[in-house]
Amino acid sequence: MNEFLMSKGIDVVESDLGERILQLMHLAPSHIVMPAIHIKREQISEMMEREMGTEKGNIDPTYLTHAARKNLREKFLHADVAMTGANFAVASTGEIVVCTNEGNADMGTSFPKVHIATMGMEKIVPNLEALGVFTRLLARSGTGQPITSYTSHYRRPPEGQEFHIIIVDNGRSDILAKPDHIRTLNCIRCGECMNTCPVYRRSGGYSYTYFIPGPIGINLGMLRNPEEYSDNVSACSLCLSCSNVCPVKIDLGEQ
């Protein structure tokens, strides 16, 4: 989406620190939760010196984080539109929920007059009771926290602002029609299957050709285009560790 918007002359700024680092370095993410985990702080320091004018050679993570925060705050203040995804959506209330540890969703949606949220249809849970279960599962499996630092609920826009929710199919209905693979849509994007996978842990996210790496990416790539992404299957060791740790019980190794 970023490339399409930029091709239309729209300035796109990632607000998640990891994604922002990758955007400025023109790199793809290597992990679904920690996208820039493969980047050394020395590389980040060099990039921020070039892009933000930070102190040369300063690789202190706190210093670099504060510099990025200051830079992003200016972007937030002058943004015309905020775009977010959604970790979950609640059918009974009509709200979406965005989970972050940086507060970038709150800050990013507070100043612009328009908020556009895009989400896959599999993100919908029936009610707030179910939401409580899934937010705890996501945080525990994704980062080992009881809950993310920020769990933001969006139901209606503030007065004078706009809020649009776009629910995406993009092949999900085709997966629903396949009984052997329907549970793949249970994925909450916690990244636990990547963290436990012996192949991913040794080869990294760039060794996969589908844009989502790891065991869940192998499955999704094969469902999307088996001819194009069949080479990823060789990255499975059949140890089934991914199936054992998956919080939503996707039998990734059996898929």
What are these regions (language model features)?
Residues 74, 119, 123, 185, ...:
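Conserved aromatic-histidine-acidic binding/catalytic patches
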Residues 11, 193, 242:
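Residue-level detector of anion-binding/catalytic polar loops
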Residues 86, 95, 192, 215-218:
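Gly/Ser/Thr-rich helix-start
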Residues 160-184, 200-255:
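Ferredoxin-type iron-sulfur electron-transfer modules in oxidoreductases and energy-metabolism complexes
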Residues 187, 191-194:
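Phosphate-binding glycine-rich loops and their immediate beta-loop-alpha structural context
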